Amino acid sequence: MPYHVTRFRGEQRKSKPRNNQTLQKPNGAISPRVRKVGGERFAIICVDPAKHRSDWMMADYFGNLLIGPQTLQHRGASFKLAVELIRQAQQKHDIQDTIVVVERTGNYHLPPKRAFASAGFETRVIHPFATKQYRVPADPGNKTDETDLYAQHRAAVAGFGLCELELEPPYRELQLRARHRRNLVEKAAAMACQIREHLHLGMPGYANLFDRLFESPTALVIAARCDSPAKLIELGQAGLSQYLHEDQIRHQIRTIDKVLAWAAQAVSDPILDGPMHHAIWTDLHELYQHFHRQTAALERELAGDLVQTPYVRLLAIPGINVVSAAELAAEMGPIAQYANANAITGRSGLYPSRHQSDQTDHNSGPIIRQANRRLRCVLMRIADNLACHCNYYRGQADVDESRGVDKRAARVKIAKRFSRLVLACVAGDEPMRHPCFQKPDSILEKLRRFHHEHQTPTDLLLADLEVAVGQLPYNTCNHEAEIVADVLQQHTHRRRGAGPIGDVLPAVLARLNIRATEANKNGDRS
């Protein structure tokens, strides 16, 4: 078996004593630095951004104003002037340590954040919720830019100015492409509903003739040719068949007969503005096809980014495809940022809310609302896929269903279990013996099929497969080499020969054999 792990049940983890506890958030604590230089020598620069300008001020740790609130235009010259004022204030008041705190406001906070960071200042981000909580008690009913700046200072002193880790390549590109693809998919899904609606208004009941309307090669082509049932009957079987032949669309006569049978029944239905609805849905369908082509191109690029990360190992799990693994890698970022699996579910908010006061304790409420929703959506989509396509998680879902567990709660349980598996699979190189890996999928074969479906050029396919080999654990190389050799042999024995794949797989197989040999020399288990 290619995946296995040795468990030591007798060993118990020794919990380290947590003597140095702090009430501040770990990535927002500034107390040690303030203690080192003194509160009068520690400055906090607060920035309240808008679209074209920001308000900012500078004060020491104790709240003494060093630079009063003023407006900063989002221009290079204005940023340089603000930096110069800060430098002068640092010299005048003997400031030895400084941080810049910028309130998160959509994307409007990015220009001042990057400008101060490029000037050499440590730049942190504060959430608007924290600003509000520190503004309302001090200035109830009075929300201005100035009161917001004062509240930001109080929140930063309390440790809510948080350091954010910048994503490095390829995670930055992967995140932008994955979010762009998801946006296109959502827009295409909404557009598909509009197409169905206008198609139904122009040709009632036509869409019900096909199980998969948009995947059928003939359904929308025939509907685009005729804007009414009467015109379908006028063309007849011979006319429709000739039209499809001219467009080089493969079809069956029984499909045309089914359409004509529907047209004979619908020809007497009262249809209002049929030609207008036909023109609308055909225009929408052209845009839908453009979205579909762009999505396919982005997916090819996502695969190229995914193979540069260890998240490609997740393809060995049945139910995980290239797009799912790429979206997870995009939203999680480098796995080294997570100390344990609870950090993953904590960031995604996959844990119940709690309300406790005195002897009242409601500790099993709904999952929390304030969380990283993008990461949560990715994990829940993967949980749906695992419940359908992975035997292990499908069995757990069936058990929960038999017990009457809510389907949403069952999916959350699967997502939490999967997060532990992600950490073990991506962060470490140890062999895995999770039930998911009893019959693992081939990572390279999944990638090859994905690129075959997306019609990726051979040179890009070879490059992605070779990069993916470098991400594989040593213990999986022999297993992958066997599958690659088997696929190559099957294609070689075909009448048409190996084709383009015969130029790709030998190089990949050689790379796998080299890694397997290195593993044996190093004494790794396979």
What residue spans do the PLM features occupy?
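A detector of single, family-specific signature residues
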Residues: 2-526
